[in-house]
């Protein structure tokens, strides 16, 4: 999980979702692409 000021999709499988007021990126194919805005 990376904490970043700006989250961007890193591949075609990355999905941007809003969870509990935080913007997140989840990715099934490569979980190291997971990000959270903070």
UniProtKB/Swiss-Prot annotation:
Domain of life (superkingdom): Bacteria
Cellular component annotations (GO), alphabetically ordered: cytoplasm; ribonucleoprotein complex; ribosome
MF GO annotations: structural constituent of ribosome
Any one GO BP annotation for this protein: translation
PROSITE patterns (UniProt xref): RIBOSOMAL_L36 (PS00828)
Statement: the UniProt record of this protein carries the keyword Ribosomal protein: yes
Keyword Transport: no
Record key words, sorted: Ribonucleoprotein, Ribosomal protein
PANTHER family: 50S RIBOSOMAL PROTEIN L36, CHLOROPLASTIC (PTHR42888), LARGE RIBOSOMAL SUBUNIT PROTEIN BL36C (PTHR42888:SF1)
UniProt family annotation: Belongs to the bacterial ribosomal protein bL36 family.
Identification of the protein by name: Large ribosomal subunit protein bL36
Organism: Mycoplasma mobile (strain ATCC 43663 / 163K / NCTC 11711)
């Amino acid at each position: 999980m990376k904490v970043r000021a700006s989250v961007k999709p890193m591949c075609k499988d990355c999905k941007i979702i809003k969870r509990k007021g935080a913007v997140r990126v989840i990715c099934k194919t490569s979980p190291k692409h997971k990000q959270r805005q903070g």
